[in-house]
Design a protein with these regions (language model features):
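Predominantly flavin-linked oxidoreductase catalytic cores and closely associated redox partners
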Residues: 325-332, 336-353
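Cofactor-binding loop segments of dinucleotide-utilizing enzymes, especially the Rossmann-like FAD-
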Residues: 10, 202, 225, 334, ...
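Glycine-rich FAD pyrophosphate-binding loop
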Residues: 218-234, 354-361
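N-terminal Rossmann-like FAD-binding beta1-loop-alpha1 element of flavoenzymes
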Residues: 196-221, 338-346
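A Rossmann-like FAD-binding core segment of flavoenzymes
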Residues: 245-296, 308-318, 322-325, 347-441
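FAD-binding core/adjacent interface of flavoenzyme oxidoreductases
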Residues: 94, 105, 118, 141-144, ...
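Signature of N-terminal electron-transfer/Fe-S-associated modules in redox systems
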Residues: 1-107, 116, 120, 124-128
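Residue-level detector of alpha-helix initiation sites
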Residues: 139, 203-204, 228, 335-337
């Protein structure tokens, strides 16, 4: 049994267990002390300073959440000076941290979805209401729920207690619920304004713009160079990750909002210009052209036959164009494009598929589940390795030379910069190389 001690709070004698904090004892005796950052299951961090009290003999106010009671301690929890201090602390919090009360999961979400809100609705069985709340910020949850990197889950506060809430799958669940019900739930639409926007690009950005413009009452025409809408969602993500029937169902839902026209197989700069669209009467223009160009490796031999960009490889697969596959394939890069290219290569019959990445496994930007899936399918990984040269014969790539790396100081991204190790050059046989080191518009 813990030792009992006596102290005085606001002129009243109270008894408490040794090791308790002033805040805990006050609550046990129905004495109110305001708090903001305090959580009884977590260690006090004394961050908000709203719970300050006066302890006799101490020159400054003390945070009651982190101050242990002592025998004979005399505490004042409510005085004019204490109230003024708490008011000042609250004003400082509101002034400097206007988003302090927004959950870290929502702050991390690129779309800014009200995550707490839709999870609360799901917990009440209000699935369609949850879906409508998601669509306030994300018009394609059915699709994104299958490919989202769910940064939110890495910042979920439940990580401090056990493990994160499965935020992304809850989003996908309510979108699947609507699809399987067979009934769409369109958002409220403003009266048609008569204005029309030309949207150049039919990928996720262009489709999202058409959705929100229609909700505001404006019409749009989507112009796209490809034979079908979807952009990288359709042409850059393999079927096993994002089935085309899922994407089509969601796109159809956007087009069914009305006053959205589609023109496919037309290229900006060849078939039309901004000026020609202006002459056709469009009131505004949106460029949503995506990131289809890929970064070059910048090494000798990258112009040899058999060297592909990750985007070109995945697009040609989707379009079912003939591809002369190699047997020993090297993939350069560590993102999801690299993983997608590697897993597709395995499925197309390659003998060996090796991903070469210049940083460590922990620093790979690809989703952990995708990395694990690639390993399960037999993809090999060479971490801390960077290609320096490609060798060929008769114009065809035959060998790849890489150097081993070691991690140095962090760069601008916060990741440790890889530094080449002298004398670590290594040659491996290849007959196909796929570069997936980044994309740009």
């Amino acid at each position: 049994m813990k030792e009992k001690i006596r102290l005085t709070i606001n002129g009243h004698g109270v008894e408490a267990e040794a090791g308790s904090t002033v805040l805990q004892v006050a609550r046990q005796n129905d004495i109110y002390i305001p708090t903001l950052c305090y959580n009884e299951v977590l260690k006090p961090i004394e961050s908000c300073r709203l719970c300050v009290v006066q302890v006799e003999g101490e020159p400054h106010f003390q945070a009651s959440c982190g101050t242990e009671v002592q025998e004979g301690m005399v505490v004042t929890t409510d005085s004019e000076e204490i109230q003024q201090t708490r008011k000042l602390m609250l004003e400082l919090l509101l002034k400097e941290h206007y988003g302090d009360c927004i959950a870290p999961c929502q702050l991390t979400c690129p779309a800014g979805i009200d995550i707490q809100g839709y999870i609360a609705l799901i917990s009440q069985g209000k699935y369609i209401e949850a879906l409508k709340l998601i669509r306030e910020r994300l018009p394609m949850p059915l699709t994104i729920g299958r490919v989202c990197p769910h940064f939110c889950e890495y910042k979920c506060n439940r990580n401090l207690v056990e493990e994160p809430i499965n935020i992304n799958h809850l989003k996908r669940f309510v979108a699947d619920y609507e699809m399987h019900s067979g009934k769409r739930n369109p958002p409220p639409l403003a009266e048609f304004s008569g204005r029309k926007v030309a949207i150049i690009g039919g990928g996720p950005a262009g489709l999202s713009a058409a959705h929100y413009l229609r909700r505001l009452g404006h019409g749009s025409t989507i112009f796209d160079a490809m034979p079908a809408l979807g952009g990288m969602l359709r042409y850059g993500i393999p079927e096993y990750r994002l089935p085309k029937k899922i994407l089509d169902w969601e796109i159809d839902g956007i087009l069914e909002l009305g006053n959205i026209e589609v023109k496919l197989g037309v290229k900006w700069g060849e078939d039309f210009t901004i000026e020609s669209l202006r002459q056709e009467g469009y009131d505004a223009f949106l460029l949503a052209i995506g990131a289809w160009d890929t970064r070059k490796l910048g090494i000798v031999g990258e112009d040899l036959q058999g060297v592909w960009s990750g985007v070109d490889f995945l697009v040609d697969l989707t379009l079912e164009k003939p591809i002369e596959m190699g047997k020993n394939i090297a993939i350069i890069g560590g993102g999801n494009v690299a993983i997608d290219a590697a897993r597709n290569s395995v499925r197309m019959g390659a003998d060996t598929v090796t991903i070469i990445y210049r940083r460590s496994r922990d620093e790979m930007p690809a989703s952990p589940e995708e990395i694990h899936g690639a390993e399960e399918e037999g993809v090999q990984f060479h971490f801390l390795a960077a290609p320096v040269r490609l060798f060929g014969s008769n114009g065809m790539v035959e060998k790849l030379e890489y150097v081993k790396m070691e991690l140095g100081e962090p760069d601008a991204s916060g990741r440790r910069r890889p530094v080449p190790m002298e004398g670590s050059e290594t040659l491996i046989p290849v007959d196909m190389v796929i570069a997936a080191i980044g994309q740009f518009p």
